[in-house]
């Protein structure tokens, strides 16, 4: 605590402890507030050692001020404490935090007005970083590209080869350069000569197209007038530095040869990026255990190398990013809907594929399995085990609905028999629609007979008993008729022997 509290000593510490936290409040600043401010600065990745000087506190105030509108109350309290400390370092006589903030605003406003007045009175000067600068005589001269820029470019090519990020790197390092500077950058590359040959072919094609669309003027040029640049002039092979400067800086009909040449280089770099990145965006798929964040990084890196318009790239992002994700992430992304932002997708899929997500899926699977064991599947096995010949879905005897048995039914319990509805017996003892055997007992409720009984009803081969009795009665009636009329036929001559 001693090191943190040593920001103020002596008279400054006395002045710090006399300042009130709020107007009219009895509470004043103490050493603990300095300790707290130091810890908060470390939490915000700022250097607490800057609190020891007025310049350091001013830097901290400028750094924290943009975040005040959306910051928390702790951040606002930290900014107020630093403002009070800034006033103490500058020996301003203040009584509370509100006066310190007002004093800070007054000083900053007066400083800005003084700087604005100074800019109006001082002549404007051309930046010395620009390759074409104005010398003391007011002439436009060329400033050679610095060795540091060349070194940064060569290192980028050696480390990144021709990945998609090499294009914005080239655009940043060649800002405002003339063709002479750009050729210097290209000649500094030692390797990748095959790729550079492809780049030269693209430059030659663009130069030929420029000559076709911008034919040179016929006849001699007027005295003092410079010729118009050709394709080879823009490429820097047939033009001098002075001509390139004049074409770029002349007032009327200026031609920015450097910018035109940079566009040609970018076209060639796009082909080289495609050549060094043969993977198509259609082949980028998320692995089963790959984090969604890594998959998004690979997706956008490959998308950056695609030779397509921005509309096509937007369509690829909206369609393929979700389509090529793994099943776990795809299920989450489809639930978010098509209007979800990339931030929402990454937050929703955070942790998918990791041990926590796997444990969660396993717990859900075990919970559903236990639920099934308590209800549906066990009920199916139990009910079908009683009658293996039954076909179709299971049906509840209590409510009459399919899909569960009466044991798991949530409807109110029926009273009496589940089959006929009468009270006094159970369904297993119900005699409604059932047949008794020779012992006077009824068959099982399933409708099947015991195993030692014939399962199908055997149809008898003999005629029914009623037909046999009728036939005997008919024969007896015929015998009576024969005895009543013995002489009605020749049969009576021989008696009953015939």
UniProtKB/Swiss-Prot annotation:
Q: Segment Dimerization/Multimerization of capsid protein p24: which positions?
A: 276-362
Region (Interaction with host CALM1), start-end ranges: 8-43
Motif LYPX(n)L motif extends across: 484-493
Which parts of the sequence are annotated with region: Interaction with host AP3D1?
Answer: 12-19
Give UniProt keywords alphabetically. AIDS, Capsid protein, Host cell membrane, Host cytoplasm, Host endosome, Host membrane, Host nucleus, Host-virus interaction, Lipoprotein, Membrane, Metal-binding, Methylation, Myristate, Phosphoprotein, Repeat, RNA-binding, Viral budding, Viral budding via the host ESCRT complexes, Viral nucleoprotein, Viral release from host cell, Virion, Zinc, Zinc-finger
Q: List, alphabetically, the InterPro entries matched.
A: Gag_p24_C, Lentvrl_matrix_N, Matrix_HIV/RSV_N, Primate_lentivir_Gag_pol-like, Retrov_capsid_C, Retrov_capsid_N, Retrovr_matrix, Znf_CCHC
Question: Mind telling me which residue stretches traverse the membrane in this protein?
Answer: none
The site annotation (Cleavage) covers 130-131, 362-363, 381-382, 437-438, 453-454
Region of interest (Interaction with membrane phosphatidylinositol 4,5-bisphosphate and RNA), residue spans:
14-33
Motif Nuclear localization signal: list the residue ranges: 26-32
Region (Interaction with Gp41) residue ranges read 7-31
Which GO BP terms apply? viral budding via host ESCRT complex; viral translational frameshifting
Q: Which residues carry this modification: Asymmetric dimethylarginine?
A: 413
An annotated Gene Ontology molecular function: RNA binding
Q: Which SUPFAM superfamilies match?
A: Retroviral matrix proteins (SSF47836), Retrovirus capsid dimerization domain-like (SSF47353), Retrovirus capsid protein, N-terminal core domain (SSF47943), Retrovirus zinc finger-like domains (SSF57756)
Q: In which residues does the motif PTAP/PSAP motif occur?
A: 460-463
Any additional notes? HIV-1 lineages are divided in three main groups, M (for Major), O (for Outlier), and N (for New, or Non-M, Non-O). The vast majority of strains found worldwide belong to the group M. Group O seems to be endemic to and largely confined to Cameroon and neighboring countries in West Central Africa, where these viruses represent a small minority of HIV-1 strains. The group N is represented by a limited number of isolates from Cameroonian persons. The group M is further subdivided in 9 clades or subtypes (A to D, F to H, J and K).
Protein family (similarity comment): Belongs to the primate lentivirus group gag polyprotein family.
Q: What is known of its domains?
A: Late-budding domains (L domains) are short sequence motifs essential for viral particle budding. They recruit proteins of the host ESCRT machinery (Endosomal Sorting Complex Required for Transport) or ESCRT-associated proteins. p6-gag contains two L domains: a PTAP/PSAP motif, which interacts with the UEV domain of TSG101 and a LYPX(n)L motif which interacts with PDCD6IP/AIP1.
> In its UniProt entry, what is this protein called?
Gag polyprotein
Lineage, broadest ranks: Viruses, Riboviria, Pararnavirae, Artverviricota, Revtraviricetes
């Amino acid at each position: 605590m001693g090191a943190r509290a040593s920001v103020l000593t002596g008279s400054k510490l006395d002045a710090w402890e006399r300042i009130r936290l709020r107007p009219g409040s009895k509470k004043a600043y103490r050493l603990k507030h300095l300790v707290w401010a130091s810890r908060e600065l470390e939490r915000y990745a700022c250097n607490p050692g800057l609190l020891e000087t007025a310049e350091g506190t001013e830097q901290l105030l400028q750094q924290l001020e943009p975040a005040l509108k959306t910051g928390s109350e702790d951040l606002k309290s930290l900014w107020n404490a630093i403002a009070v400390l800034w006033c103490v370092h500058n020996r301003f006589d203040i009584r509370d935090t509100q006066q310190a903030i007002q004093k800070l605003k007054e000083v900053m406003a007066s400083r800005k007005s003084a700087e604005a007045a100074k800019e109006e009175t001082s002549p404007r000067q051309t930046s010395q970083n620009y390759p074409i600068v104005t010398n003391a005589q007011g002439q436009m001269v060329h400033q050679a590209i610095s060795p540091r820029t060349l070194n940064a470019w060569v290192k980028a090519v050696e480390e990144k080869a021709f990945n998609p990020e090499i294009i914005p790197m080239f655009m940043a390092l060649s800002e405002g350069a003339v063709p002479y500077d750009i050729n210097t950058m290209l000649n500094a590359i030692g390797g990748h000569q095959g790729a550079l040959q492809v780049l030269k072919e693209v430059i030659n094609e663009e130069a030929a197209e420029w000559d076709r669309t911008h034919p040179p003027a016929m006849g001699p040029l007027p005295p003092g007038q410079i010729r118009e640049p050709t394709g080879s002039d823009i490429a820097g092979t047939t033009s001098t530095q002075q001509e390139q400067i004049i074409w770029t800086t002349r007032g009327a009909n200026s031609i920015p040869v450097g910018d035109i040449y940079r566009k040609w280089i970018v076209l060639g770099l796009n082909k080289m990026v495609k050549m060094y990145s043969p993977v198509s965006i259609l082949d980028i798929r998320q692995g089963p255990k790959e984090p969604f964040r890594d998959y998004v990084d690979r997706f956008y890196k490959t998308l950056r190398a695609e030779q397509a318009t921005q509309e096509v790239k937007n369509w690829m992002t909206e369609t393929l990013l979700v389509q090529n994700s793994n099943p776990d992430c795809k299920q989450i992304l489809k639930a978010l809907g098509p209007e979800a932002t990339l931030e929402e997708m990454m937050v929703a899929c955070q942790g998918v594929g990791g041990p926590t997500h796997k444990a969660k899926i396993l717990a859900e699977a075990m919970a559903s399995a236990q639920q099934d064991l308590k209800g549906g599947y066990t009920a199916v096995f139990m009910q079908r085990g009683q009658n293996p010949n039954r076909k179709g879905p299971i049906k509840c005897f209590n409510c009459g609905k399919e899909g569960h048995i009466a044991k798991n039914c949530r409807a109110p319990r029926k009273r009496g028999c589940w089959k006929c509805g009468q009270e006094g017996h159970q369904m297993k003892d119900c005699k409604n629609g059932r047949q008794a055997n020779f012992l006077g007992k009824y068959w099982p409720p399933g409708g099947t007979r015991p195993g030692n009984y014939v399962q199908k009803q055997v149809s008898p081969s003999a005629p029914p008993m009623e037909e046999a009795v009728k036939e005997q009665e008919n024969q007896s009636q015929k015998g009576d008729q024969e005895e009543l009329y013995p002489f009605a036929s020749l049969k009576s001559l021989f008696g009953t022997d015939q």
